[in-house]
Amino acid sequence: DESKSLSEHILECAKEMNNKVHTYAEENQLEHMGTTFAGIVFGKNEISIGNVGDSRIYKVRNGKIEQLSVDHVLPEELKSFKNIITQYVGMGEEEKEFSPALSTEEYCNGDRYIICSDGLTEKLNDEEVGVLCHVAQSVTDASDILVSQALGQESNDNITVIVCELEELTS
């Protein structure tokens, strides 16, 4: 449906994923089953992002990193309850309002975007992620370097990293 915005498409997909995971968990008597979600949709002049949980989306522009996603985690003062997320795919609508974080922004030629699981960000801080992504020769190299650096710090969590770069199309 072309009348929908990119953000509306992301929201629709996230709600559908949430309902399917929640239904599967209920049908199979699996308590607290869920997952995180982070995604980007590229439009003609802008991107829309959406996320649920603590998987992140970053933008690296001219060597500077910016977190675009929102972490759905307990506030700082409750951090002793580690790894508790306040939103996740599969939580169902009746538990609490399922509310993916959504945003839209313009992009520039050369921007690199990183989608990653918390396995990466538990071992590398934002600045380290930004520098490693910026200096890598290609997006494949950037992904490989980021995963390698996190694994080198003995991460026990799964590590998922996707890096993409926007290039101006020439005809």
PLM regions and their residue ranges:
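PP2C/PPM-type serine/threonine phosphatase catalytic domain
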Residues: 1-171
